């Protein structure tokens, strides 16, 4: 099977690292392509950046998505996930949802350890969106900006490990979800520093979930929430809108 892993930011080095992690998690016979949108923010640490990135994700899916058996959105806010499911013909998985659902199978309660504190309320909203407030012990920030992880992975591992230990000791977390796609490179060191506590990388979780969905022949439900878009006039000539017109039929096309 072929899987498309979309890093919603435009930092190529991060996309390359995400791709390596996805390939390491993939089973035999699974081909991974990791891509970034051609436009958008260099990193995602706020609502405005997330909104831009969500639109860029839809752009990538509209142009490339039909060439794959499944799609992963590799940012922990899962930007554009629900909209992506509407326009995609194949299953779409977000790394946050995948990792949290996996955490719920190996632990009673989990904590998310993420980047700067500004992101914490955003991820608390994500937890609530997925109906997991009772299973989430906490969302904890660190001093790390997203792009700091690659610049100094040793310091990043230390900060994530320290905050994970606090989540276990103070919040009674039983599993740790790494709350940034770039943290996959830290998984082994963080896991080795915790005693018997599962550490879940969202990129790996999303790849395995997609492999399962594709293997079982399961696609996105077209009842209610994720129905394909109905006929709608799209105004403008931007390239993104041109790509999206192939997914959202014009009213005249369905008369």
For each of these PLM feature ranges, what is it?
Residues 54-108, 112-113:
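Glycine/small-residue-rich loop that forms an oxyanion/phosphate-binding "nest" at active or ligand-binding sites
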């Amino acid at each position: 099977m072929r899987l498309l892993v979309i890093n919603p930011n435009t930092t190529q080095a991060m996309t390359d690292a995400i791709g390596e992690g996805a390939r390491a998690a993939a089973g035999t016979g699974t081909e991974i392509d990791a891509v970034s949108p051609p436009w958008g923010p260099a990193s995602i640490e706020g609502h405005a950046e997330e909104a831009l990135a969500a639109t860029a994700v839809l752009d990538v899916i509209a142009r490339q998505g039909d060439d794959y058996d499944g799609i992963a959105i590799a940012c922990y806010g899962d930007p554009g996930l629900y909209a992506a499911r509407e326009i995609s013909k194949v299953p779409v998985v977000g790394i946050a949802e995948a990792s949290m659902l996996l955490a719920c199978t190996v632990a009673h309660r989990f904590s998310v350890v993420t980047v700067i504190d500004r992101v914490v309320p955003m991820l608390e909203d994500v937890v609530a969106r997925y109906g997991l407030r009772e299973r989430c012990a906490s969302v904890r920030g660190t001093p790390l900006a997203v792009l700091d992880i690659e610049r100094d992975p040793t310091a990043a591992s230390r900060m994530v490990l320290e905050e994970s230990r606090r989540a276990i000791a103070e919040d009674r977390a039983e599993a740790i979800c790494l709350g940034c796609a770039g943290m996959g490179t830290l998984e082994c060191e963080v896991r080795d520093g915790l005693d018997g506590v599962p550490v879940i990388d969202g990129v790996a979780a999303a790849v395995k979930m997609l492999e399962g969905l594709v293997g079982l022949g399961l696609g996105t439900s077209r009842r209610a929430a994720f129905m394909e878009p109905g006929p709608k006039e799209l105004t403008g000539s931007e390239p993104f809108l041109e790509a999206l017109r192939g997914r959202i039929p014009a009213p005249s096309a369905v008369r």
